[in-house]
C-alpha cells in the first residue's frame, strides 16, 4: 500500500479482470478529483509495459520506489477498467478459461420435426416445414441442444442471429455431428445425466456448418479496412446463411481479440521521474481538501 494515502479510506478493489483484489483508496473519491490532477499532463510520458512487468516493479524502475504504482491506474482509464496486462504466455490459457464453451456456425434454418410411425416404431422425422432461426420457438436461449452422434447435450447460452452462431455449454461435441436437435431442458439434462438416453421430444433440427471451441471461435469478422462484416444469407425464405462468404482471413477469434486487447493495455502514460514528488504531493493535497 502506498505510503502517500494511508490516511485515506481504503477498500478491496478489483482492477478489470484481475483475479485478486488490491487494497486501494476508494476510487470514487480519487476519480472525482482526477480531472484536477490531469492539469499535470505536461509532465507525462508514454511507456510500453514490458512482458511480465508488474506495477510495483515498474514503479521502482521509474521512481526507485514501489509505492507509486497507484499513479498508473489513476492516469490510465483502460488499466482501471481492464486490469494490468497479462504475461504473453498467460493470454492463451486465460482465453481458454474466459471462453470455455462450444460455438456452432449453423445454416440458420430450423427444420421442424413430427412423430411418424416407421416399421411399427414411432420416431421423429423432418417435415417440409422450415423456419428461419429468428422465428423458431425452440432454438432459443435457455433451451437445450442434443447431439445424437456425440451423445451429449448442452444449454443454449447465446444466439447471434446476424452471424448465425449458437453458443452452448455442451461438452464433447464431435465433428461427426452435422446437425443439432432442439430439446427441452428436462430432456437435455437427462442426456447429460445418462449419455445413452435418447430424447423423446425432438422438435426441430438445424445444420451445423462449423464448430469451434469458444476461445478459438470468431468474435467477429472484418474486411481489409477493419469494418465488421457478417455471413451472407439468401433472400429466399427460409433465408439460409452461407458461411463460406466469410473465411479465416476475415475472422478475429476471442483469443486473438484478447491478445490484441492485452497489447493495448501495455501502452500507458506515466509521470516523469523528476515530477513524481510534486504531482503526488499535489494529489494528496486535493485528496485532503475533498474530505
Residue ranges and their predicted role:
Residues 1-291:
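Cell-surface/extracellular proteins and modules involved
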Amino acid at each position: 500500500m502506498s505510503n502517500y494515502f494511508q490516511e485515506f479510506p481504503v477498500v478491496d478493489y478489483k482492477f478489470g479482470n484481475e483475479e485478486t483484489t488490491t487494497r486501494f483508496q476508494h476510487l470514487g473519491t480519487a476519480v472525482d478529483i482526477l480531472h484536477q490532477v490531469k492539469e499535470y499532463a505536461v509532465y507525462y510520458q508514454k511507456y510500453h509495459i514490458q512482458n511480465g512487468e508488474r506495477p510495483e516493479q515498474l514503479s521502482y524502475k521509474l521512481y526507485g520506489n514501489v509505492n507509486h504504482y497507484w499513479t498508473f491506474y489513476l492516469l490510465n482509464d483502460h488499466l482501471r477498467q481492464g486490469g494490468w496486462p497479462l504475461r504473453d504466455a498467460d493470454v492463451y490459457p486465460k482465453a481458454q478459461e474466459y471462453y470455455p464453451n462450444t460455438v456452432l456456425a449453423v445454416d440458420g434454418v430450423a427444420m421442424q420435426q413430427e412423430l411418424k410411425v416407421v416399421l411399427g416404431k414411432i420416431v421423429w422425422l423432418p417435415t417440409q416445414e422450415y423456419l428461419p432461426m429468428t422465428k423458431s420457438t425452440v432454438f432459443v436461449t435457455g433451451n437445450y441442444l442434443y447431439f445424437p452422434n456425440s451423445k451429449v447435450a448442452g444449454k443454449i447460452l447465446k444466439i447471434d442471429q446476424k452471424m448465425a452462431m449458437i453458443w452452448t455449454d455442451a461438452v464433447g461435441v464431435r465433428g461427426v455431428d452435422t446437425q443439432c436437435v432442439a430439446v427441452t431442458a428436462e430432456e437435455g439434462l437427462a442426456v447429460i445425466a445418462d449419455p445413452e438416453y435418447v430424447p423423446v421430444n425432438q422438435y426441430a433440427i438445424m445444420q451445423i456448418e462449423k464448430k469451434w471451441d469458444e476461445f478459438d471461435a470468431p468474435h467477429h469478422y472484418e474486411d481489409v479496412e477493419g469494418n465488421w462484416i457478417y455471413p451472407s444469407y439468401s433472400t429466399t425464405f427460409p433465408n439460409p446463411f452461407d458461411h463460406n462468404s466469410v473465411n479465416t482471413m476475415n475472422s478475429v477469434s476471442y483469443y486473438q481479440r484478447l491478445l490484441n486487447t492485452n497489447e493495448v493495455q501495455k501502452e500507458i502514460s506515466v509521470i516523469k521521474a523528476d515530477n513524481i514528488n510534486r504531482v503526488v504531493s499535489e494529489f494528496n493535497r486535493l485528496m485532503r481538501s475533498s474530505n
